Amino acid sequence: MFGNLKKKLSSAIQEGLVISENLQQQYRQRVSSGNSGSSQASGITTPISPLGLNESLSSSRSSSLSLSAPFQLTDGVPSHLNVAAGCSLLAKYEDDWQQIHGANEKNAEKAAQIANQISGIQDQASHQHRIMSELNSSLAGIPTLIAQLQNSSQVLNSLEEMGKQLEIELEKLEDLREECELQEFILEQQFQLSRHKQKKLNELEQYRQQIAQKHQSKIKDQEQTLLKLQRERQAVFDDAFREDMEEYKQRGQLTKIQTTSNKLALEEVVLEANEVETKDALEQFLNG
């Protein structure tokens, strides 16, 4: 936008310069052709007014024209004609354009700032809009959420009941497990007891066999001892019998062997304490 305006102002300045040069050339041609300067000057001044010349500009430039009168006279231009009016106007337009350009740059900066602010506001509005949309969707889902919460509450209640039932079943299972462990312990103890009993029986059998072997060996030893004694007694008896037979053959009779038996009197018997008690009990029984 500002570039187009600058181009238009530049083209206007160039056109103004071209027009001023054409005017100077026309004045020079008319002066050289011998026409009256007053009539032509009046005819030339008339088209200047449409270019935006006014009395304030001609009065402001009168001092500069009076200083440049010799130059204009040499060129054939009247002294009361303001040839630099277009340049002053163009300079004024250029100054105005520079001011406008500066103001436009400031406006552009402010517009950029405002655009940034608008973008920020738009972003905030979009964010708020998105939040509102999410809030609306969330609010729209509240009934469904309430229904789900109710279902969840029912499920939790059912789970609580199932948990209680599960605790009861777990207690039963624990009791059953303890009972099974007790039975296993009893069976294990019975098995250990049976093993111990069998072990003791085996040991007892081994001990009995050992005792039996020892007893058999003792019996054999005793039998051998008795047999030896019997043989010795038999030998003694045989010797005594032969002696008796020899004596009988020689004398015709046998000598009597006197045996003395040790007899005890009743007064000589001494009873111990247990025997005294037994005697007292016997007397009470007989007297009773």
UniProtKB/Swiss-Prot annotation:
One of its GO terms (biological process) is regulation of neuromuscular synaptic transmission. Keywords: Coiled coil. The keyword Endoplasmic reticulum does not apply. It comes from the Eukaryota. The keyword Metal-binding does not apply. Residues 147-239 form a coiled coil. InterPro entries: Dysbindin (IPR007531). One of its GO terms (cellular component) is neuromuscular junction of somatic muscle. Component of the biogenesis of lysosome-related organelles complex-1 (BLOC-1) involved in pigment granule biogenesis and membrane trafficking in synapses. In response to high synaptic activity at neuromuscular junctions, stabilizes Pldn protein levels and, together with Pldn, plays a role in promoting efficient synaptic vesicle recycling and re-formation through early endosomes. Component of the biogenesis of lysosome-related organelles complex-1 (BLOC-1) composed of Blos1, Blos2, Blos3, Blos4, Dysb, Muted, Pldn and Snapin. Interacts with Pldn and Snapin. Belongs to the dysbindin family. This is Dysbindin protein homolog. It comes from Drosophila melanogaster.
